[in-house]
Amino acid sequence: MRTEPPVPTKALEAIRAALGPGAESVDAPILQPLGLLLDLAGEAMRARLFVVQAEGGAELCLRPDFTVAVARRHLDGGAASGRYFYEGPAFRAAPGTERPEEFVQMGVEAFAPPSGDGAAADAEIAGLAWRAATAGGRSDLSLWLGDVGLFAAFIESLGLPATLSARLKRVAGRPRLLQAELARAGHVAAPAANQGQLAALLAGRSEGDTAALLEEVWALAGIEPVGGRGPAEIAARLVRRAEAAAAPALGQPEAQAIAAFMAISEPAAAGLARVRGLAGGKAKALTAALAVWDARLTDLARSVPADRMRFAPALGHAFDYYDGLTFEVRSEALGPDRPVAVGGRYDGLLARLGGGPGRAVGCMVRPWRAFAGGEA
């Protein structure tokens, strides 16, 4: 396993000093449940994970990052609010490259009740990531901003059929699936019956009804599921497949608007103006979301120079639990594939981990990339 060179103590201390104040220092188990992480990132992530399994035991993996583990720790503690700082090694396989596979991460995860001011917290954490990244000494950094939730509001502005709108929102963080939707623009949807008997059977059913149907079939057949996905998760996947088969295709004008939205990559203020120009006729939710962005940029301008901020609404990360703001601090020398810092908002992850409603936002810094004499 390839490891990073050590970062000088002075640089580590500077980055730590930018992130740590006001946060409780925590650790996380190096071994994490594989199934949970694949559910959050998709099966394609498996190739990037170091998988371990004792004979007869559950599949585990070396932690690829800290966010999920820290969120689970927060939920286990039962507190409504919490702010946690972590520092330690993370592990991701990088076959066919010379990149380190064991590397140090530092970061902060902040949790609050659902009534908290999300936009202010977003700006605070993104600004924190910027200060921590610049503390390493690089002078070629820029802050890239995106928003998973803004895509949903933009889709609503186009006035699409409900089934198509829902499907597009679900694939927002999966470029391959979204491109497939754009590619079939203008095509007439085939009837569900032509997409297979299962799709025809499930068309129009809720996930709850489908899960109950699966359990009934298993009971009649005497099937006892062992491990793997449960009926609720299988039902969700089957219902989405049925919806995909029955959903109408995009029209060409709407597909072009979505493609233009996904291609935005401009200075922050200009990028928001571009979104406003692409909006459809039902833009109430989008107008509200853009007002939040105006406030967010005002807050960010207190810590990040305006000429260093860029807006790219399609910006995403390897894990698809982000459901609001996303951001990266990038180095011109390292390029977009090796960000110095990443983060964003992931309120929905708390419910997916078994918790109640709440707000969650965090950031992670790679010290070796932030260090001016480090990764090149």
Tell me the role of every PLM-derived stretch.
Residues 1-9, 56, 60:
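Short, N-terminal intrinsically disordered low-complexity segments that are rich in Pro/Gly
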Residues 4-26, 30-33, 65-78, 84-138, ...:
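Positively charged, Gly/Ser-enriched RNA/tRNA-binding surfaces
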Residues 28-47, 146-156, 315-324:
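Beta-rich nucleic-acid/ligand-interaction surfaces
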Residues 30-60, 93-95, 103:
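Polyanion/phosphate-binding surface patch
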Residues 43, 65, 114-115, 124-127, ...:
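Polyanion-binding and phosphate-handling cores
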Residues 46-56, 159-191:
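Acidic, His- and aromatic-enriched active-site or binding-groove loops in soluble protein domains
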Residues 147, 173-176, 267:
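Short, solvent-exposed helix-helix connector turns and helix-capping sites enriched
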